[in-house]
Structures are given as C-alpha cells and as structure tokens.
C-alpha cells in the first residue's frame, strides 16, 4: 500500500460523520436552542416562522460549497443543487440524501410539504413540484436556517 492510498483511507473515514454514516438525532429543549441561536434563526427553525423573501444573503450565494443546518451543522444541500428560483429564498433541486425529513403542512388552506433537518428537527422550508428538470422539485429554504461553508473550508463538527 502506498502512503497516498493510506492517506485517502483516513480522509474517507473522517468524512463519514457528515456523509453516509448513520445520523444520530440531536435532542435539545426549545430553551436550549433559544440560548444557542440568534432570535431570527430560532424563530424559523423551532417556531416554524418564515423569513421575508429577498432578505438572506444566501439567496445570492454562488460559490462552491455546502449548505448546513444553522442549528446542528448537518450538511443539507450541495451548492451544485442550488438554483435561482426568483422567489427570494435560497432554492435547491435536491437535498443530500437522508439528511432531510418531510411532513404535510396544513397551516395554509392548500396543503404543502414541509421539510426539516433530520438530525435536530429544525424547520428549513417547503418543497414544491415546480423546479427544474430532471426532478422537477424546488426545495425552498429559509436562508436563516442555513449556513454556507465554502468548498475550500472544512465543515464544522456536528453540534452536540
């Protein structure tokens, strides 16, 4: 085995917690989350508020990288899945597999599909069937529910 192959193996092992390994649920009370997060992020993530459109700098983010949950830091979307939907919220064609959970939302007259971080339960946004091909999905996210990590930066450790 060459040294380069050995190093690649170590890199793969350390990458497992973010991608591919079993995701362990992070349970915190609303009071604990309120102490950890800015009020605007807490309101969206754990009270299911919606931020105003065109207010998040992440709506215009075009660099390569990963969008992570602002609460627990689980990677949720790759920048390659981001597109400009014209809605004023960061939008994606698909999430990272296994990192998002969905449920029906009946808060408005028309039922919608809400999605949240599978690890901490933080509300992210809603998925609609008006996105670009091939999937036709628009994962419409509240920017305050996400943080962006540029491709040349390491992902933070998952919050405990």
Regions found by a protein language model. Give the residues of each.
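N-terminal secretory signal peptides and thylakoid transit peptides that target proteins
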Residues: 1-14
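Boundary at the C-terminal end of the N-terminal hydrophobic targeting segment
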Residues: 18-20
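A short Gly-Trp-Pro
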Residues: 25-28, 32-160
């Amino acid at each position: 085995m060459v040294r380069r192959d050995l190093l690649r193996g170590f890199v793969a092992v350390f990458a497992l917690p973010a991608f591919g390994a079993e995701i362990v649920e992070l349970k915190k009370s609303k009071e604990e989350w309120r102490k950890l997060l800015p009020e605007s992020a807490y309101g969206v993530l754990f009270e299911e508020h919606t931020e105003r459109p065109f207010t998040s700098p992440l709506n215009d983010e075009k660099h390569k990288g990963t969008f992570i949950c602002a609460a627990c830091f689980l990677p949720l979307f790759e920048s390659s899945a981001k597109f400009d939907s014209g809605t004023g919220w960061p939008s994606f064609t698909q999430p990272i597999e296994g990192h998002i959970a969905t449920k029906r939302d009946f808060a408005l007259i028309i039922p919608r599909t809400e999605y949240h971080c599978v690890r901490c339960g933080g509300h992210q946004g809603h998925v609609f069937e008006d996105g670009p091909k091939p999937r036709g999905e628009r994962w419409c996210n509240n920017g305050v529910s996400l943080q962006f990590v540029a491709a040349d930066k390491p992902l933070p450790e998952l919050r405990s």
